[in-house]
Design a protein with these regions (language model features):
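Short acidic-hydrophobic sequence patches enriched in Asp/Glu that either
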Residues: 47, 138, 219, 223
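Ordered core of a single globular domain
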Residues: 206-232
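A short linear-motif detector with a strong N-terminal bias
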Residues: 1, 5, 95-99, 222-226
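Structured mid-domain segments that build the active-site/substrate or prosthetic-cofactor binding neighborhood
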Residues: 55-199, 203-208
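Hydrophobic alpha-helical packing residues
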Residues: 5, 146, 150-153, 223, ...
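Conserved, charged catalytic cores of large soluble enzymes
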Residues: 4-5, 9-86
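Short, glycine/acidic-rich hinge or "gate" loops at secondary-structure transitions
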Residues: 16-22, 157-170, 216-218, 232
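Conserved small/polar residues in nucleotide/adenosyl-binding loops
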Residues: 1-10, 230-235
Length: 235
């Protein structure tokens, strides 16, 4: 079935054969299933061929290294990407942001992101130079602006009544969504995330010293680490 889906997708639309982008497909690659000589190697090959023609499916490695694969290996949980290829951070059943103990498990199904606001990093560097200010001082201003926008969004959404979307908030469509129609939804928003977006790292590096991130990505990496530290919650 999956192989057939790949074949249908890479043919494109009738007529001009234009690639079909929606609905998006994500291929969950498991080396033990899709690797060389494994039972579904042919499905993997079909996926590669489809990606070469249409840029989809997106790929997630369940047997590699990193956040996505570690959650799969430890808990058997698949973290599906949202539309912009962003991923939900874990929320544990009993402990919330952090596991209560080694038996606590993360929840991803039924959760959502309330919104994303992206940093235009080259613009921030250009602004800092034009105003003769420290880059990180200007970056802090925009990071705090995004944080405040997200807080405002949480507060605004929290005042909405469950009756605005009964399927999601009253019938369990969203995680914790078993409210009465007249209840405010703020009480179930805590497991939901808000995103700080990052754009144009390569252009940032080129503006910084005229080199791409392939030639010298240190400044871009430093900025990324800085943003990650800023947005990381304290235990």
């Amino acid at each position: 079935l999956v192989g057939s889906e790949m074949c249908i997708r890479d043919r494109g639309k009738a007529g001009r054969k234009k690639p079909v982008l929606f609905p998006k497909i994500v291929f969950l690659y498991d080396e033990n299933i899709h690797g060389k000589g494994k039972i579904s190697e042919d499905v993997f090959e079909a996926g590669v061929d489809c990606s070469a023609k249409t840029m989809y499916p997106d790929w997630l490695s369940m047997s590699g290294k990193g956040y996505i694969s570690s959650m799969y290996k430890q808990y058997g949980k698949v973290i599906s990407p949202m539309g912009c290829r962003a991923f939900l951070s874990p929320w544990y059943e009993r402990g919330g942001m952090y596991p209560a103990d080694d038996k606590d498990v993360p929840v991803f199904v039924g959760r959502f992101n309330i919104g994303a606001v992206s940093l235009h990093l080259p613009m921030i560097l250009a602004k800092a130079r034009a105003e003769s200010r420290d880059f990180y001082e200007v970056l802090d201003f925009y990071l705090e602006m995004i944080r405040n926008l997200h807080i405002r969004t949480y507060d605004y959404l929290g005042q909405m009544r469950a009756s605005t979307n009964p399927l999601a908030y009253c019938e369990g469509g969203f995680y914790g969504g078993h409210l009465k129609p007249n209840e405010k939804i703020g009480k179930i928003l805590k497991p939901m995330t808000a995103s700080f977006g990052i754009t144009a790292l390569n252009e940032l590096q080129e503006l910084y010293n005229g080199k791409s991130i392939a030639e010298d990505g240190q400044f871009a990496l430093d900025v990324l680490k800085y943003c990650l530290l800023y947005t990381s919650p304290s235990p």
